[in-house]
Amino acid sequence: MRKPLVGINMKNYINTRAQTSEWLEATIPLLKNFSDVDTFIFPSMGTLETTANLLAGTSFGFGPQNMAPEKSGPLTGEFSVESIIDLNANYVEIGHAERKNLFHEKTSEIAKKIKLALDEKITPVVCVGEEVRANDTNELKNALKKQIEALFQTINLAQWENVVLAYEPEWAIGKASSAETNYIESAHQALREIIRELGGDETLVRIIYGGSVSKENAAEIVRQKNVDGLFVGRFGHKPQNFADIVSIVSKTKG
């Protein structure tokens, strides 16, 4: 059985060590009764060491919002997987829409990052999702299949179980409301079908939804069979809000 998972991406909103410490010190105690749900945070890159120190000895996972496609070398401004390992981090975010749209990351580069993370025993949270809303389930599956085939063509089949897919339809990111629940479930089901068609064991892969997640829609979303958790954005900047989401997932999926 797949363990429920809730994560938060701080992007570049909470950027100082003091702010990050305040958020974590407030949040950690609020999660003590939810051991049935895995949690992780992608803090602002400049606060990773602070995050590592505060989360040492806890089950709260963390990692950077991006990583280099190579272990080391002339890659100015990149973040090495060696640094991730040195921090005792266990997750890395890969392929977010903003990385592709603002920094022009290519699919081939993202695929290399995924493979490198898996080879180094770091769990990649891989962001996938169509740019525009699909008109029907076939169109939706075709759009997702094109992405998945390109991103995961080099991984070993056994590595699928260590992948987390974050389904974030680009047209729903940062909007006032999420995609409709039946649309979300159709996308998650399609992703499982695609994994199976590629030879992976879709029953082991955790797929979480991100895109305008809130307390108001969390239960309805995670009630869906193929949704394993949630990827929270700005709504989770208040510690109690994030804890409330974890609580909802625990009650709904537990």
Swiss-Prot record:
Active site: 96, 168
Organism: Listeria monocytogenes serotype 4b (strain F2365)
Any GO CC annotation of this UniProt entry: cytosol
This protein's name: Probable triosephosphate isomerase 2
GO molecular function, one term: triose-phosphate isomerase activity
Zinc is among the record's keywords: no
The protein's enzyme class: isomerase
InterPro entries per record: Aldolase_TIM, TIM_sf, Triosephosphate_isomerase, Triosephosphate_isomerase_AS
Biological role: Involved in the gluconeogenesis. Catalyzes stereospecifically the conversion of dihydroxyacetone phosphate (DHAP) to D-glyceraldehyde-3-phosphate (G3P).
Pathway membership, UniProt: Carbohydrate biosynthesis; gluconeogenesis; Carbohydrate degradation; glycolysis; D-glyceraldehyde 3-phosphate from glycerone phosphate: step 1/1
The family this protein is said to belong to: Belongs to the triosephosphate isomerase family.
Localisation: Cytoplasm
Main location: cytoplasm
Record GO biological process: gluconeogenesis; glyceraldehyde-3-phosphate biosynthetic process; glycerol catabolic process; glycolytic process
One Pfam family of this chain: TIM
Keywords: Cytoplasm, Gluconeogenesis, Glycolysis, Isomerase
EC number: 5.3.1.1
Known partners and oligomeric status: Homodimer.
Reaction(s) catalysed (UniProt annotation): D-glyceraldehyde 3-phosphate = dihydroxyacetone phosphate
Taxonomic lineage: Bacteria, Bacillati, Bacillota, Bacilli, Bacillales
Keyword Ribosomal protein: no
Residues where substrate binds: 9-11, 174, 212
Superkingdom, taxonomy of origin: Bacteria
